């Protein structure tokens, strides 16, 4: 909702007050009293009071949060006592509580429930936060205290988690410019501030491009092949937009089915081009210059800090350790999977030729369509056959029930917990002894103001302080097929897999059991964080799991054994193609961030060269991945996209133990909870994995699971 002029003026004055300007005190006190961020939340489990938070609350609360954080840091700096682990490292880890509270809500909602006003505020506040972060990481007196503890602390008196926190804290300074001279610190501030602005602009362009496009079709004949459920959803979208006929968007539940089922090749091509050119067209949403800026800024920062490349900087704190190990994994998988992937493409091409003629060339907009036709022919299976058994409410019960079966935890919806949109539900998570574990929010459907994709996030971290175990608040956000006027939300197999994936991340947060807030849950190496999520995907084709929830939404019939068998037989369909596709993204990522010199070339040409070894279909002029590759440009996966395959290596090896002992084996589940899910980054991930599995992971289990080796 747009602010009126008087409120906006008042907001600006109060924000200035928090950074030292002079103004009417009673006016600001009034703002404080009405701003929910300024007091403890009086909600169940102190959850965020979304129903009371307004756009005008963020800026003054954020500025006050910065002020409080600065005061807490100054108290650490000015402590007359000798620096110790408790008075410096622990104090620093707990500092900034109010600021964290505000920024967590603001940036999470900027992804899940944003507006033009909110995005403008994000552009305004991001540089302020970057400056504040730099003020801390470049503070010489603060770093001197941290370094004193790092250099002189008796590590024999520290627990493993405390030693890890000490190392992590020291690295957070050293890797963020604390050892630079004054002129280089000034340059570091300039570069990081510019990077925060640029990555935000990149992601906002992505959101605008996605939400601004709609393909409206008024001739039903052009939609031949589309299932009734897809047509109904498209008709509902058209109605919501005030249009006639059927409307398709670039959101996955709309885009995917048209590409998979629509017989009109030109319509498929039109939507494909819209999706794959959305941030490379000659308009205000073009991201090519932002790509260059982001790549060059990250390189400049890395080299300023003494690294040859951004990849060297990032991988220093990863399981992979260096670019050589990443490239070795990518090369191993490319060699192992490429022959099978080529065979899979050939088979789909042959399927297309049977209906289109010998001269037919398989293009990217044909892949999903003919791939689905071949799958249906080989296994008598398609998404529309299984959708009726995957009613969202039943899937939710099944996924939650899986956690109950494995870990003994239960989920109870609490409608008294405020939510930020009517689609969102909030649940209390209870441990097997009935004690409170966490709050989990679920947000399932696409809407304007919500970015595409699926993700898990935290609204509150877990930690232990003063004898109290403060439990986490986590959220899983998806973009599933929406219910229509005549049918409930019915999911595809892929959507159920996505649910399991994000729920695995949520369990990582829910079970957190560390002492310090920065050490628990998903606060782990990027190439370890996907293990808890990807291991959950392995349960999907298991008959024992499907039998717990896959009931027909109309008849109540349990999914037939014969259909389950087809799902199992089809689970490795085109698995090599999917692997090579992921490897192409990994190659592209490493190509951008292994650079040791700045880039000012053609983004499209560079991309084509980078992933050429993994290209299986023709490259289409006018399309580009990099300009919409939010993962590596603005989403935290720079020099890290390989993590998905690295974690897949881990999850295949880990789940082999479940397969060996039984998928519901309590001893294995308990070991996974105690050694992986609860530990966060309190110990090195290699140590944690070996303790759970008794061995290091290799690609062998993954290749065996995928049918690449027998």
Model-derived regions, located:
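Bacterial N-terminal signal peptides that target proteins for export
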Residues: 3-14
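Hydrophobic helical h-region of N-terminal Sec-dependent signal peptides
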Residues: 14-20
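C-terminal motif of bacterial Sec signal peptides marking the signal peptidase cleavage site
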Residues: 24-27
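C-terminal, non-catalytic "cap/extension" segments appended to globular domains
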Residues: 31-57, 64, 224, 245-247, ...
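N-terminal helix-rich structural modules
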Residues: 31-227, 232, 247, 658
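Short His/Asp/Glu-rich catalytic/ion-coordination signatures at enzyme active sites or charged loops
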Residues: 42-57, 106-125, 147-190, 249-289, ...
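Active-site-proximal, well-structured secondary-structure segments within enzyme catalytic domains
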Residues: 161, 165, 197, 204, ...
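Short pre-active-site segment immediately N-terminal to the catalytic Zn-binding motif
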Residues: 481-500
């Amino acid at each position: 909702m747009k602010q009126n002029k008087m409120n906006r003026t008042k907001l600006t004055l109060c924000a200035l007050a928090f950074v030292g300007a002079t103004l009417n005190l009673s006016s600001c006190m009034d703002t404080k009293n009405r701003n929910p961020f300024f007091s403890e939340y009086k909600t169940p489990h102190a959850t965020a009071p979304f129903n009371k938070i307004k756009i005008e609350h963020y800026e003054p609360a954020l500025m006050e949060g910065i002020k409080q954080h600065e005061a807490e840091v100054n108290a650490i700096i000015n402590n007359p006592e000798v620096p110790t682990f408790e008075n410096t490292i622990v104090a620093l880890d707990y500092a900034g509580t109010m600021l964290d509270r505000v920024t967590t809500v603001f940036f999470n909602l900027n992804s899940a429930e944003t507006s033009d006003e909110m995005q403008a505020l994000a552009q305004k506040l991001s540089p302020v936060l970057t400056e504040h972060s730099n003020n801390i990481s470049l503070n010489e007196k603060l770093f001197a205290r941290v370094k004193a503890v790092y250099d002189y602390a008796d590590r024999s008196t520290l627990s493993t988690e405390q030693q890890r926190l000490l190392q992590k804290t020291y690295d957070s300074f050293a890797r963020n410019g604390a050892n630079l001279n004054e002129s280089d610190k000034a340059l570091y501030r300039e570069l990081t501030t510019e990077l925060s602005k640029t990555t935000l602009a990149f992601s906002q362009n992505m959101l605008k491009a996605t939400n601004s496009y709609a393909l409206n079709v008024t001739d039903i004949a052009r939609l031949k092949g589309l299932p009734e459920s897809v047509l109904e959803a498209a008709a509902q979208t058209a109605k919501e937009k005030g249009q006639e006929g059927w409307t398709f968007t670039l959101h996955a539940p709309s885009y995917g089915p048209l590409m998979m089922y629509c017989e009109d090749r030109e319509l498929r091509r039109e939507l494909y081009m819209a999706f794959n050119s959305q941030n490379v067209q000659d308009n205000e949403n073009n991201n090519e210059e932002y790509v260059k800026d982001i790549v060059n800024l990250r390189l400049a920062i890395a080299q300023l800090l003494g690294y040859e490349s951004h990849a060297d900087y990032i991988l220093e704190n990863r399981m992979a350790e260096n670019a050589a190990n990443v490239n070795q994994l990518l090369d191993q998988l490319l060699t192992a999977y490429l022959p099978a992937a080529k065979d899979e493409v050939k088979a789909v091409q042959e399927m297309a030729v049977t209906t289109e003629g010998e001269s037919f060339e398989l293009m990217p907009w044909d892949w999903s369509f003919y791939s689905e036709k071949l799958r249906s022919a080989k296994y008598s299976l398609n998404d529309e056959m299984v959708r009726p058994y995957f009613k969202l409410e039943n899937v939710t019960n099944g996924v939650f029930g899986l956690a109950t079966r494995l870990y003994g935890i239960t989920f109870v919806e609490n409608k008294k917990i405020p939510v930020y949109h009517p689609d969102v539900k909030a649940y209390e998570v209870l441990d097997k002894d009935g004690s409170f574990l966490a709050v989990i929010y679920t947000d399932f459907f696409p809407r304007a103001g919500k970015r595409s994709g699926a993700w898990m996030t935290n609204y509150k971290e877990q930690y232990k302080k003063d004898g109290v175990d403060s439990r986490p608040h986590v959220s899983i956000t998806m973009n599933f097929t929406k219910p229509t006027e005549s049918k409930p939300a019915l999911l595809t197999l892929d959507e159920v897999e996505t649910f399991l994936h994000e729920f695995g991340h949520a369990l990582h947060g829910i079970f957190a059991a560390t002492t310090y807030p920065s050490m628990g849950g998903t606060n782990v190496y990027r190439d370890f964080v996907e293990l808890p999520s990807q291991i959950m995907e392995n349960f999907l084709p298991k008959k024992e799991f499907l039998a717990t929830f896959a009931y027909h939404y109309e008849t109540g019939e349990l999914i037939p054994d014969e259909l389950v068998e087809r799902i199992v037989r089809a689970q490795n369909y085109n698995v090599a193609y999917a692997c090579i596709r992921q490897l192409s993204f990994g190659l592209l990522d490493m190509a951008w961030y292994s650079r040791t010199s700045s880039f000012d070339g053609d983004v499209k040409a560079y991309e084509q060269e980078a992933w050429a070894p993994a290209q299986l279909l023709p490259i289409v002029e006018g399309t580009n991945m990099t300009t919409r590759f939010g993962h590596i440009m603005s989403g935290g996966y720079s020099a890290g996209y390989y993590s998905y395959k690295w974690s897949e290596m881990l999850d295949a090896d880990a789940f082999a133990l479940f397969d060996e002992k039984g998928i519901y084996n309590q001893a294995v589940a308990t070991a996974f909870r105690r050694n992986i899910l609860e530990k966060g980054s309190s110990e090195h991930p290699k140590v944690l994995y070996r303790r759970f599995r008794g061995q290091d992971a290799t690609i062998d289990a993954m290749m065996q699971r995928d049918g690449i080796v027998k």
